[in-house]
Regions:
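A residue-level marker of the well-folded mature domains of exported/periplasmic proteins
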Residues: 2-216
Length: 216
């Protein structure tokens, strides 16, 4: 007799629909990802992950416009990965976003990293609040062969697998140049830096100060 083709489940239909996303919908966020190429993956093509793999992303804060966008990006990445690999149900890759309850709290972030490493993720992405923190945790991650990728604000730790961030030196330099231009290269300037501990803030402050001192 004829063999009936099994009907697609709702989950499989959803995956297929995600695969068939229109070009217009893709452009909503793909353009932003293209900007960081080739420093990091800007799509899911060629990425190989096992069923049920867990990836942990740790930010600096919750509930602000910037970090809400980061969190949305994490969710989108998980959806894209599962759609690309065809994983459904319990097979899905899990990607979570966690951050300190109080923005830029160093101790809370270190504790979060400890907790996440205890779950043995296949990789950790972290935006580091304090450049001097997390060294012990990074050693543990290295010993456990858990890759660490920094984003937004990185670390000098040699074992970091990759960094995805703005060129902070270039950003600080350009900000100083434009400031000096608006001031007509005369007068006094005040720099307001968001914090005094993160790599991003320190690099931008130094670059801006160096530019103003040397050339204006």
């Amino acid at each position: 007799g004829c063999q009936q083709t099994p009907k697609a489940t709702d989950e499989e239909k959803k995956i297929e629909a995600e695969k068939n996303t229109t070009k217009t919908e893709e452009k909503e966020y793909q353009g932003k990802l293209d900007l960081i190429s080739p420093a990091a993956y800007n799509n899911t093509n060629g990425l190989k992950l096992k069923k049920g793999d867990y990836i942990s992303i740790i930010g600096k804060a919750n509930g602000t416009q910037y970090w809400d966008e980061v969190k949305k990006g994490v969710t989108q990445a998980a959806e894209d990965l599962n759609a690309s690999l065809g994983y459904t149900g319990k097979d899905k890759i899990k990607v979570t976003y966690n951050a300190p309850d109080k923005a830029d709290n160093v101790d809370d972030q270190v504790n979060l990293l400890d907790e996440e490493l205890d779950r043995y993720p296949v990789a950790v992405g972290i935006s580091i609040v304090d450049l001097q923190a997390c060294q012990v945790q990074f050693d543990l991650a290295t010993d456990s062969e858990i890759p660490v990728v920094t984003f937004d604000s990185g670390s000098d730790y040699q074992g970091v697998a990759a960094d995805v961030s703005t060129d902070n030196v270039a950003a600080g330099t350009e900000a100083a140049q434009r400031l000096a231009e608006e001031m007509g290269d005369s007068g006094e300037a005040v720099l307001f830096i968001q914090d005094s501990k993160s790599q991003a803030a320190l690099q931008r402050e130094k670059a801006a100060t160096d530019e103003l001192t040397a050339n204006h």
